[in-house]
């Protein structure tokens, strides 16, 4: 799955409130160090190319059994973009990695002539396909360095980002707004992004606003120690989310934003939380074009209708009509 169960988040939060000692040190809330994922030195999947998968669950199982698997066509640092194209960086979701998220996208985009890259950072060593569980700020710094490496290798001035879940929401938006990414990103194409939080709004508000600030800090510290800070950060009323999205526009001039979301998303609830309601953002509801698309959050990067929309967003001057294909609900 791309996002933690909200039940897991709530249970962890209240276990923290009852179990954490009253003298827990404030230093526990410090940003944890970046963790290099197994099989992905410097963030680059290096365990060989994996087969193309058509659904997220087979891809995730394969990624777990083969840490550091590279999606076909990705991370070729000798690739030079065609004229008019930027290198494309694919950002995975929480609890996922480059292969599990992008085993379908990477080879398809490569066949279209794009230079495609996708990194693994900041996850759980014991579950080697669970990347991006750690503090989003740390992940964003790692992504910043990865983008710089891509720009240097390709001789490009900017990249286009395609991201799913966290990888389309708080991760790239933190990089763009806080780490100078607005000078290096041409397009952000966000697939089912967790922009305004995951899970039901009422539960998110209860966890983050119905407890004292001291207890809130203990919760943050516990998640950080377990290297799952991004779980708490993606609650809509987390301090991180409020800092990133609650202080004026999150979009930046010069970056073209596209958000693609489906109404059957069971992680970003309501699905409208994915959208950025700011000037210049193109928010796309999949069912406005493909009414028989029932894909949920976890299978969103294996939805062929969404893929066509993403390709159109990459190259809007040559956009093609979407050929809709029935997509079952896979939650």
Map each language-model feature to its residues.
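Alpha/beta-hydrolase active-site loop signature
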Residues: 95, 123-125, 195
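Flexible, membrane-associating and regulatory peripheral segments of lipid-active enzymes
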Residues: 3-4, 13-107
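C-terminal catalytic-base region of ester-bond hydrolases, centering on the histidine
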Residues: 210, 250-331
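Conserved alpha/beta-hydrolase
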Residues: 108-127
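Second-shell loop/turn segments in exported
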Residues: 93-97, 128-136, 229-230, 294-300
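Serine-dependent carboxylesterase/thioesterase catalytic core
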Residues: 92, 137-244
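Extracytoplasmic/secreted proteins, especially bacterial periplasmic and envelope-associated proteins
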Residues: 86, 90, 100, 104, ...
């Amino acid at each position: 799955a791309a996002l933690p169960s909200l039940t897991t988040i709530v249970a962890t939060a209240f276990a923290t409130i009852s179990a954490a000692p009253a003298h827990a040190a404030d230093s526990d809330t410090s940003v944890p160090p970046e963790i290099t994922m197994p099989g992905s030195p410097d963030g680059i999947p290096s365990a060989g190319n994996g087969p193309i998968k058509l659904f997220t669950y087979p891809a995730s199982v394969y990624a777990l059994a083969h840490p550091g698997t590279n999606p076909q066509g990705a991370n070729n640092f000798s690739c030079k973009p065609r004229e008019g194209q930027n290198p494309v960086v694919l950002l995975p979701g929480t609890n996922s990695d480059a292969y599990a998220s992008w085993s379908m996208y990477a080879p398809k985009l490569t066949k279209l002539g794009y230079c495609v890259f996708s990194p693994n950072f900041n996850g759980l060593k014991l579950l080697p396909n669970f990347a991006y569980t750690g503090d989003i700020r740390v992940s964003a710094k790692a992504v910043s360095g990865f983008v710089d490496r891509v720009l240097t290798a390709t001789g490009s001035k900017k990249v286009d980002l395609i991201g799913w879940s966290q990888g389309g929401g708080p991760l790239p938006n933190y990089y763009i707004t806080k780490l100078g990414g607005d000078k290096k990103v041409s397009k952000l194409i966000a697939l089912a992004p967790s922009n305004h939080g995951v899970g039901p709004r009422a539960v998110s508000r209860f966890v983050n606003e119905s407890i004292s600030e001291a207890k809130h800090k203990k919760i943050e510290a516990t998640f950080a120690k377990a290297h799952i800070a991004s779980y708490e950060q993606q609650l809509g009323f987390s301090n991180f989310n409020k800092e990133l999205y609650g202080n004026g526009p999150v979009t930046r001039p010069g970056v073209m934003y596209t958000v693609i979301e489906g109404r059957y998303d069971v992680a970003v609830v309501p699905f409208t939380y994915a959208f950025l309601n700011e000037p210049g953002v193109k928010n796309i509801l999949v069912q406005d074009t493909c009414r028989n698309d029932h894909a949920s959050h976890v299978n969103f990067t294996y939805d062929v209708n969404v893929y066509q929309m993403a390709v159109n967003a990459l190259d809007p001057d040559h956009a093609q009509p979407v050929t809709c294909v029935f997509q079952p609900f896979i939650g």
